[in-house]
A protein has these predicted regions:
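C-terminal amphipathic alpha-helical interaction region
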Residues: 10-11, 30, 34, 63-154
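N-terminal interaction modules that seed assembly of large macromolecular complexes
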Residues: 10-64
């Protein structure tokens, strides 16, 4: 048997919402609170299912985008420690595709993005403003990537 996490979560949500919530309503006179709790649990499991499905892909995509940005940013920032770390980060690759390793890499890259953003804000040039705009676009895109689906999207 090959465990299918997505299918397991679908079945669990179906049981909670289709069987458990109505059963609580029939079994207990004052059950609205517990029914709500089980309903929220079901919705959280749907979110987990969605995140499980996209977890590695989202992190790989974001890490690649950050590295592409860092490759272009070195010339804007100039020489120095941040520039050297940007080059090193841009040349690195994610070879371990486990979610925990990708998340660790992502956290390091996002930390470097914060440093880059701070450095770029101190530079007075059109290239720096263009890079700053790119940083803001990536931050917005990063938020979009993390968005959970609405109930109809699952």
């Amino acid at each position: 048997m090959k465990p299918d996490v997505g299918r397991l979560l679908e079945v669990a949500v179906g049981h909670l919402m289709g069987e458990t919530v109505p059963m609580i309503g029939r079994a207990y006179e004052h059950s609205v609170y517990e029914q709500s709790n089980v309903g929220v649990l079901g919705m959280m499991l749907l979110a987990v299912r969605h995140e499980h499905e996209r977890a590695a892909a989202r992190r790989v995509e974001e890490n690649q985008e950050l590295r592409r940005m860092f490759a272009r940013a070195g010339t804007v920032v100039g020489a120095g420690d941040v520039s050297e770390r940007l080059v090193a980060a841009a040349e690195a690759e994610d070879t371990d595709l486990t979610v925990s390793a990708l998340e660790e890499s992502n956290a390091e890259l996002r930390g470097l993005l914060i440093e880059l953003h701070a450095a770029v804000e101190e530079i007075d040039s059109p290239e720096a403003r263009t890079l700053e705009d790119e940083i803001w676009r990536e931050l917005a895109e990063s938020t979009r990537r993390r968005a959970l689906p609405t109930l109809g999207d699952t």
